[in-house]
Amino acid sequence: MTNRAAACVCGLPTASCSREPARVSLCHCLACQRRTGSTYGIAAFFPRESVVVAGDAKAYTRSSDSGYAVTFYFCPNCGSTVYWSPDRKPDLVAVAMGAFGDPAFSAPTQAVFTEHRHKWVRSGPAG
């Protein structure tokens, strides 16, 4: 059994994942660009029953580019996003790939909203 631990910069909220991710997705949507302050976001999606969250987290819900609501959980202390729950996929929890702090983590298997990809970013998976 795989155990992975994700945390924010200061370690307050955590997400422990007991299985391999169902998928790892690189998202170029404008909302992810704004949320991360980067040109894309990368999420590892895990079956909900395999994720245990702990510590204080502040929630923020917004409509996604797909039209479904998504609730983000971030640290009230350092502001880092650790995980989120997409209404479109209620059986999954998304965890920010960078929150694992593991350079050997699985590479993304798909790219979405590639029409918003910055031209200087290499295409990556399926895009």
Feature roles, as predicted:
Residues 1-127:
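A short Gly-Trp-Pro
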